[in-house]
Amino acid sequence: MHIVFVTTFGQKGGVAKTCTSIHLAAHWANSGRSVVLVDSDRNRSATAYASRGLLPFDVVPMEAAAKATRRADIVVTDGQASSNEEELKNLVEGSDFIVLPTTAQSRSIELTVEMSCMLNKFDIPYAALIVKADARKKASIQIARSILSGLNIQV
């Protein structure tokens, strides 16, 4: 059995990394996959959501990940906001795919581009995910998508 490891990561706080992790994990769990979400964020937001008992998958702290993920089909790691290249290297080594949540705001896009440049040093597939998108502001979403795509960042 091959376990797939997906990590959400980014330099900026408040771009919905935890929300993205929870939605990805819920999607896969609801499609019949065995999913564990590893909460590696200092704030432990995913753990707080899980304590309400409404998630269709287990959420465990990083310290319990080795044992808790043994029988999972998919492990989603909710990474913390960081630009530390050594931390990024460790996450990459433990991941099959990286998701970079970003808003359509210019600073968030800039940081996603910077993160992409760091990820390009490693042999890891990744994609940006535009989050917190206001449907009334379609132009800003299209501009963000165009900028990221124009820099060969999968969106």
Where are these regions (language model features)?
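P-loop/Walker-type NTP enzyme "switch/lid" segment
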Residues: H2-V15, I22-E93, S146
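Short linear functional motifs in flexible/disordered or boundary regions
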Residues: T20, R33, D58, R107-E110, ...
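Short amphipathic alpha-helical "recognition" segments used for binding
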Residues: V15-A16, R136
